[in-house]
A protein has these predicted regions:
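Conserved GNAT acetyl-CoA-binding A-motif
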Residues: 156-166
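Active-site acidic-Proline motif in GNAT/NAT acetyltransferases
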Residues: 134-136, 140, 169-170
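Conserved acetyl-CoA-binding loop-helix of GNAT-fold acetyltransferases
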Residues: 139-153, 175-180
């Protein structure tokens, strides 16, 4: 499964200003963003990236399903598996955008993928993405557990009103996962990216806090410790 983060502007400057503002006569409080937490589920742990995660990544070749999820822009810019992975892990451990959270997905003591949440502190919304690079572990409900953990933290701890994502229209496994977690189909970006076999559509999906509160699956809340790395 794979979904991707949209590009929100950094909110670092916004957090240095007033903690509230007015939109069309409505007073809103800017979200306060804590440090990256450790989120623990029944089978997976979401944590900060560690140097040894690069070895876990390199044990598993990039397969077509994973590559499709990254999109055509990633394929154009990719310059070697180790370079890309090390660059990604460095960015994840020391993000330039302080409104972006990136977790390594740990299962059975090894990193098997990553999940991300990019937050708009003014609009109380975030864009979510997840990818598992171990093909044999897809389809076992791990992506659903990761998604539920991040949604629980986003709504219950951050105080988000909305979480959104986009996914390749042909990725039926990922779409089923998101639907099971309460996300709703909101639209289509038609022929949004060019792939080797033609233009591809992307499905837009979203989950609102009231929908989550009345029926979306919940996972155990994260512990209060800081990010950990192996």
């Amino acid at each position: 499964m794979n979904s991707r983060l949209a590009h929100f502007p950094s909110n670092a400057a916004a957090r240095e200003q007033s903690s509230s503002y007015v939109v069309l006569g409505v007073m809103l409080d800017r979200l306060t963003l804590p440090a990256l937490p450790v989120l623990r589920g029944k089978r997976v742990i979401l944590r900060g990236s560690g140097e040894s995660d690069i070895d876990d990544r390199l044990r598993h070749p990039i397969d077509p399903e994973e590559e499709d999820g990254y999109g055509s822009s990633w394929r154009r810019e990719w310059d070697g598996r180790r370079y890309h992975t090390r660059e990604y892990l460095t960015a994840a451990r020391q993000p330039a955008d302080s409104s972006a959270y990136t977790w390594a997905v740990e299962y059975d003591g090894h990193c098997i993928g990553s999940a991300g949440l990019r937050v708009d502190v003014d609009q109380h919304c975030a864009t979510y993405a997840v990818g598992l690079f171990v093909a044999a572990l897809r389809g076992q409900g791990l992506g659903r557990e990761v998604t539920s953990l991040v949604a629980s933290w986003g709504f219950d701890v951050l105080g988000l009103h909305r979480i959104q994502l986009e996914v390749l229209a042909g990725n039926s496994r990922a779409i089923r996962c998101y639907l099971a977690c309460g996300f709703r189909h909101e639209g289509v970006r038609r022929e949004a990216e060019l792939y080797p076999d033609g233009w591809k559509d992307f499905i837009l999906m979203g989950l609102l806090q009231p929908e989550y509160a009345t029926g979306a699956p919940r996972s155990r809340l994260p512990d209060r410790g800081g990010p950990k790395a192996r």
